[in-house]
């Protein structure tokens, strides 16, 4: 029998294709070229692997022969050799040629070797060194560990095993077996201590997003580690049985709330079925995944191009997921699994990212290049340039605008052409963009007036939507003067959510409220828009049962902004018009409380002055604001304030705010404004604004 196997094995070796790189067949392994390994009892191999694998799959003939002869260990050994030499699938997200590892990835790999310090995104025992928390307890691993005051996100991400891929890269680069030994020890421990729940998904280890992430990583881990002497037939059987169980779980439990998690789940299933076709259920995994992706690209991307969760962070993520699914299908001759019009919604979705990228993206070394509305945070220019826009150009090579974004970012040499400066209205999502150019010195105002939909219908603290309809960000000449407060932290069930609540507070955004109470409804409605020398957008939201906020924004000669805000309804109490400024010292961001406004005095002469006027007496109330650029519980302080008015039930609160960008000192700037209509009208408003001696009459009629 052994001699027959030797002849067959040599023939297979001679006629099989090349592995991913030349050393794949020359390193590692535990098979002597002349002999099979010493026999081991059947019970060292998980017998379920032979139930999960399709023994009739081409290339598994020896596996089937050994299995039917009752030689389970030799069958598993033949299966391992099959995986080491197979060339029947292609993972476009993985290359084993000249693998490199970053300093950050190396640190994650090494920290995991000592006291089980497992990397969990944005959670560190020492933020300076990015040292992870240790989950070691009584000599073992406590998979239920969560640092003090950490949000639910820690437990969720712990079970995504974010340090495994760095360890795999470290192994591939160094050849040091300690990395695979750590992986096997830890993953085996995880399997033993986190069995699949009998009742379906839980909120931590077996939540759909965690399972999806693990599946996506495991197809890579197999390739990185498979030639190690420590990757034994016994371990392969354990690994494959667990892989099949997790993929089957995703088929059985589609994420009911849809959104980005369902897309991640579908992508994982498509990946599992495509790259692991040897499993009996591979076709089911693949078909389920591609079917969901085909449906959800239409269901979740609205007609204006926005993803229904209306968070730019998740929007960018789902476009990347759809792109990866498309590339996976193409690389494995499975494009027919996706509809021919699969990319049509993705074009608009890619253009959303383009229009929501601030022009400092084109400055070499600049960060914080996108707005942070809802559960979203700033993104570095390198991620957009080297990953996202690169993918968009690959999908849409005919787009000269996307080509410009991909090439000109981070100080690059521009190709293609700049997008136009027209007002962009994303009415389905409730976002409106006003701009005067695409150079770093340009001005861009983005306004948020979201409306609920079937994927984003809650303003509860755990949702990705913040109760901030009417808010805005304003970028000018390299500086975001009114950045969103950010997220800071995710929700914690039954825990301390003070930071989560604070950053979601409506007065921590640039909009109107009553008594600083969060709105109850997100039902943004676009009422009017006009283009021309002076651009206009008018929108409203019935955020409370008895109070509606209407905001009209005039972009006067594309030089300065006039905001007309009205609190409409029979609500009575204190109306708060809130403004949250950029970071700066007290001498750089200066409150002008007596003038109901603020001005900046930055040394680079890039400044603004803000003044608010009203239809009755108001007071200016400064407070210490906050801004968070990540979701790690950390934040910086900044200057914020509210313009407060006491409103009776029969009154409409009316404000005029002028925001004037200034090149130099604001000392000589003069601003005044007043209403020139006869009072609140359901269909119109008219104001007179004087800026530096020049008077402008601004009005709209619905």
Swiss-Prot record:
User: Subcellular localization, per the record?
Assistant: Periplasm
| Entry superkingdom | Bacteria
In short, the EC number is 4.2.2.8
- Catalytic site: 314
A Pfam family this chain is assigned to: Hepar_II_III_C
What main location does UniProt list?
periplasm
Segment forming the signal sequence: 1-17
The chain's coiled-coil residues are none
Reactions the enzyme catalyzes: Elimination of sulfate, appears to act on linkages between N-acetyl-D-glucosamine and uronate. Product is an unsaturated sugar
The GO molecular function terms of this record are: heparin-sulfate lyase activity
| Keywords on record | Lyase, Periplasm, Signal
Write out the GO cellular component annotations. Answer: periplasmic space
Keyword Iron found: no
For this protein, the record's NCBIfam families field holds:
Hepsulflyase_bctds
Q: Which family does it belong to?
A: Belongs to the polysaccharide lyase 12 family.
Q: What does this protein do?
A: Specifically cleaves heparan sulfate-rich regions of acidic polysaccharides. Does not act on N,O-desulfated glucosamine or N-acetyl-O-sulfated glucosamine linkages. Functions in cleaving metazoan heparan sulfate and providing carbon, nitrogen and sulfate sources for microorganisms.
Instruction: Return the protein name.
Output: Heparin-sulfate lyase
